[in-house]
A protein has these predicted regions:
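Conserved Rossmann-like nucleotide-cofactor binding loop
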Residues: 82
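Peripheral, non-AAA+ core regions of ATP-driven protein-machinery
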Residues: 1-37, 42-48, 55-62, 66, ...
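P-loop (Walker A) phosphate-binding loop of NTP-binding proteins
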Residues: 52, 79
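Conserved RecA-like ASCE P-loop NTPase motor core of nucleic-acid helicases/translocases
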Residues: 74-78
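Conserved helicase motor
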Residues: 104-106
């Protein structure tokens, strides 16, 4: 492999001699982006942001370029749009920042020369699939081109202390097309997903400088992406009338905040007598496990049923507190009886159908109360000092939860 162009030569030095201020973060100007990154953009870091074509990655990157709270320059390199197209999109978004340098280019050496001349604090490349090097005998988008071009850009960013954002496209199957091969080379991997028609969710799959549990929530509008002011309720359906069977509301702990989400279940007779589980937003193994617990302890037959599970708004749920609302959602769908309105449910379920405590119960109680719910079915609090309000119904078993859950 060739030596990277314009690379600053580095030498070993004692760990104790390195000042922590060398790792200062930049304020992106987007609170949700700062949250997901762990407090802002780390200087010298490299982030891969992936999503389906048309989801809004370019819009997010242009708004990030305009929002960065720093005096330095931002270099926005596009291999897919001309400068005029970028300007038209910037006008629509209300972006008018002289610090943003726009460069329409796909050749690696030209990009590195521009970086060396401008010395930007942040470089945005949209997208990595379009980059090619004349020294590599293959077309843009191939594994060799992506891997070697990315390495050159990463070397430059690391040696000059500039933050680098690489945009990549995701296939229909949800995989990063091409850039999957550089995930191990970058510091952060971000996915930009569509929650609903307007909602966009930014979540982290890898982060060397922060948690991978945080998510950012945006709303897409005519003027671009807007940060959601009340994310706790953004995933709840605004329905009129009675809640249908199979729907359970759960206060889930995502990153550092509580989100109220709808667990939606549909249970129908299996075709051909073979039961199947269809679930994208909750792990299918968890759904199968909860179905087995239900069949064993509540005596409802599910082994001859097809089970469909969804989470309203498109958010993915992995925390254990989803067990109890998932069980009651499945039970509600199977007996075709709705859970009473304004009821929220949370709790972990063991294979013995015991309801185990969950973390941050006090914050979940507060979030449910603020959203106007009249009942919360939950495990007993782990903290003995926690005062449980009257609208909370502590349960210790799945049988007790089912009995309590369907009381009006």
């Amino acid at each position: 492999m060739r030596k990277s162009r314009d690379r600053v030569e580095q030498f070993p030095r004692p760990l104790s001699s390195i000042e922590s201020k060398e790792g200062l973060r930049l304020d992106s100007g987007l609170g949700e982006m700062n949250r997901v990154l762990g407090g802002g953009i780390m200087k010298g870091s490299v982030a891969l942001i992936a999503g389906e074509p048309g989801i809004g990655k370019s819009t997010l990157m242009l708004q990030l370029a305009a929002g960065i709270r720093s005096e330095g320059r931002v270099l926005y390199i596009s291999g897919e749009e001309s400068p005029v197209q970028i300007r038209l999109r910037a006008d629509r978004l209300g972006v008018r920042d002289s610090r943003i340098e726009v460069f329409s280019e796909t050749e690696l050496s030209a990009m590195l020369r521009a970086c060396g001349k401008l010395k930007p604090i942040v470089v945005i490349l949209d997208s990595i699939q379009t980059v090619h090097s004349e020294d590599i005998g293959s077309v843009p988008g191939t594994v060799n081109q992506i891997k070697l071009c990315a390495q050159e850009l990463i070397d430059w960013a690391k040696s000059h202390g500039a933050a680098l954002f690489l945009v990549g496209h995701v296939t229909k199957e949800g995989y990063i097309a091409g850039p999957k091969v550089i995930e191990h080379m970058v510091d952060t991997v971000l996915y930009f997903d569509s929650g609903s028609a307007e909602i966009r969710i930014l979540h982290c799959a890898k982060n060397r400088f922060g948690s991978v549990d945080e998510i950012g929530i945006f709303e897409m509008g005519e003027q671009g992406l807007r940060q959601v002011e009340n994310p706790a309720a953004v995933f709840l359906s605004q329905r009129v009338g009675e809640q249908p069977p199979g729907v359970a509301v759960a206060p889930m702990y995502e990153g550092s905040r509580i989100l109220l989400v709808e667990i939606q279940s549909l249970v129908v007779p299996a075709k051909g007598g073979i039961s199947r589980v269809f679930s994208e937003r909750i792990d299918s193994a968890r759904v199968s496990r909860m179905a087995a617990v239900l069949e064993k302890h509540l005596k409802v037959r599910l082994s001859d049923q097809d089970i469909y599970v969804n989470v309203g708004g498109g958010i993915r749920i992995s925390e254990v507190g989803v067990d109890l609302p998932l069980c009651l959602s499945l039970y509600s769908a199977r007996i075709n009886q709705p859970i009473p309105p304004l009821t929220a449910i949370v709790g972990e379920i063991s294979l013995a159908a015991e309801v185990h405590p969950v973390g941050h119960l006090d914050r979940r109680i507060r979030a449910v109360q603020e959203m106007g719910f009249s009942r919360l079915i939950s495990p007993p609090p782990k903290e003995q000092k926690l005062q449980v309000p009257e609208f909370c119904y502590p349960v210790s078993s799945l049988t007790e939860a089912a009995r309590t859950g369907f009381q009006t």
